[in-house]
């Protein structure tokens, strides 16, 4: 009787070790993808800086940044089935600052007695679909290498969340395996 229980215990332990090896393999391959994405992004960024060296502002950097820009993506941390899961989601269209601006607009419209509804919907749409690369020169004047750099860096965002999830799952599996021994 104890031999069958021991065999079943070994089977579950073996499955957990196999799962750990699989998670480590996935973590390693995802880390290589992240490294490749960052490498490509920085190479393209250096190319765009090289082609932009003769401009008045110099390299693409903090001088070009629009400080009022609010990001489009947001990381959420949830607990599902006693596991901490990190997900990347799109930010909601309106933030607190925009709501305050709308309230101020309503007050000024009440004083004036006008209702420019078309202007509101157009400005709201622009804020929602704003591409941050436009702060580096507009639609037509952004170098293709800078666009490729943006694409490489955007591709890294889900990989980072995936790496965090793998790491959390590996840590919980290692804890359960150490408790069993």
Swiss-Prot record:
One Gene Ontology MF term: unfolded protein binding
Superkingdom of the source?
Eukaryota
Keywords associated with the record:
Acetylation
Kindly give the InterPro entries that the UniProt entry links to this protein. Answer: Vma22/CCDC115
User: Its GO biological process terms?
Assistant: vacuolar acidification; vacuolar proton-transporting V-type ATPase complex assembly
Q: Which GO terms describe its cellular component?
A: nucleus; Vma12-Vma22 assembly complex
Does the entry feature the keyword Hydrolase, yes or no?
Answer: no
Q: Where is this region: Disordered?
A: 93-125
Compositionally skewed regions (Basic and acidic residues) per UniProt: 93-107, 114-125
Q: Name one Pfam family in it.
A: Vma22_CCDC115
Further remark: Present with 752 molecules/cell in log phase SD medium.
Stated role: Required for V-ATPase activity.
User: What is the designated name of this protein?
Assistant: Vacuolar ATPase assembly protein VMA22
């Amino acid at each position: 009787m104890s031999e069958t229980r021991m065999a079943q215990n070994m089977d579950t332990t073996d499955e957990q070790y196999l799962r750990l090896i699989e998670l480590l393999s996935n973590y390693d391959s995802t880390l290589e993808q992240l490294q490749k994405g960052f490498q490509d992004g920085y190479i393209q960024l250096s190319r765009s800086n090289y082609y932009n060296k003769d401009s008045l502002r110099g390299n693409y950097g903090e001088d070009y940044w629009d400080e009022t820009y609010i990001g489009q993506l947001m990381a959420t941390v949830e607990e599902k089935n006693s596991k901490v899961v990190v997900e990347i989601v799109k930010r909601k269209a309106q933030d607190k600052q925009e709501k305050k601006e709308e309230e101020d607009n309503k007050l000024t419209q009440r004083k004036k007695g006008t209702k420019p509804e078309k202007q509101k919907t157009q400005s709201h749409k622009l804020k929602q679909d704003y591409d941050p690369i436009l702060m580096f020169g507009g639609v037509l004047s952004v170098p293709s290498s800078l666009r490729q750099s943006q694409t490489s860096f955007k591709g890294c965002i889900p990989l980072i969340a995936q790496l965090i999830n793998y790491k959390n799952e590996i840590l919980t599996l290692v804890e359960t395996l150490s408790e069993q021994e």
